[in-house]
Amino acid sequence: MEFQKYRTMHFPRDVYIGHDVLNRVLDVVDQNSRTRDVIIVTGNTTYELAGKKIVEILASSPYEVHLSFAGEANYENLKKIEEETNDVNAGIIIGVGGGTKIDLAKKLAYDKNLPFISIPTSPSHDGIASPRASLRRNGISYSEEGAMPIGVIADTSVMIKAPYRYLAAGAADVISNISAVKDWKLAHRLRGEEFSSSAAAMSEYSAQEVISQVGEIRKYDESSVWLVTKNILASGTAMAIAGNSRPGSGSEHLFAHALEAAGVNNMLHGEMCAMGTIVSLYLHDDNWQKIRDVFESLGVSVKARDYGLKEEVVIEALRRAHAIRPERYTILGESDMSYDAAVKALELTGII
């Protein structure tokens, strides 16, 4: 039989990670923008951290910069940004900020079929360099196809200004690749889902690299930020190879999104994924204790009470997490987990 398999992969072309690299934005824009108009999606705080300097650099070139100050990553705000920028003959879109601003920018770039530059101001999760955008509607998070960044500019001198909690959450998000890949392998074995061994290996390597460097990460200097960020980038690249988010999103992310749907809003994405990773590894009958110890060493709690969560909220999130993305098969199965099984898993792992 003639071999007919093919796949298109998109990767970042210009990646700058390190001290004082914001000024490289002009090089990346010059090489990739189709016009002299640039759209920047940012927030009030992140504008002061990095956006203002980027505007000054580009405006002196000169580029016409169109700023869009965005709120949460939801479909309402996406529509608002689209309406604000409809008449702009933009040649490139830049996202400056944390996960929400970057998700909105990458989705906007995808919808407009424009190149996208990711400029994170904190290393809080692995969406910095992935082709997926997480947007919410009615409290539910949906994973949408977004533009893979043509450029990533991660300035450690900017990112170090974020609280350590954000760095720890980003590290936890990368570590959660362990359970995501286990779910992917399970879906491949039981459902015949397409599997990429190279994407899985890159994803797992990123997680193990972070685990092996917890002591360095805890120092919380620019080197710590660089270490976590480079593995976040590798995780995003794994998703680009796979053509989907499987290398970095499994049952632990479904659980995280179920918590969000239940109204939990005082946890960072990586913290929710850490909690989900522990219960996922327990269900996989893997060494969840080891990973729980790693999270504790990072300073990431997986105990519901430390976030003020009611036990019933966590129990119901676990029971119904599978329904967040019913097409994504994981260790959670295809129907609601029994109440007793959910309680047992959460109690034995120390989550409740």
UniProtKB/Swiss-Prot annotation:
Belongs to the glycerol-1-phosphate dehydrogenase family. Binds 1 zinc ion per subunit. The gene is egsA. NAD(+) binds at G99, T100, K101, I102, D103, T121, S122, P123, S124, S130. This is Glycerol-1-phosphate dehydrogenase [NAD(P)+]. Its EC number is 1.1.1.261. The keyword NAD applies. It catalyses: sn-glycerol 1-phosphate + NAD(+) = dihydroxyacetone phosphate + NADH + H(+); sn-glycerol 1-phosphate + NADP(+) = dihydroxyacetone phosphate + NADPH + H(+). Its cofactor is Zn(2+). Keywords: Cytoplasm, Lipid biosynthesis, Lipid metabolism, Metal-binding, NAD, NADP, Oxidoreductase, Phospholipid biosynthesis, Phospholipid metabolism, Zinc. One of its GO terms (biological process) is glycerophospholipid metabolic process. GO terms for molecular function: glycerol-1-phosphate dehydrogenase (NAD+) activity; glycerol-1-phosphate dehydrogenase (NADP+) activity; metal ion binding. Zn(2+) binds at D173, H253, H269.
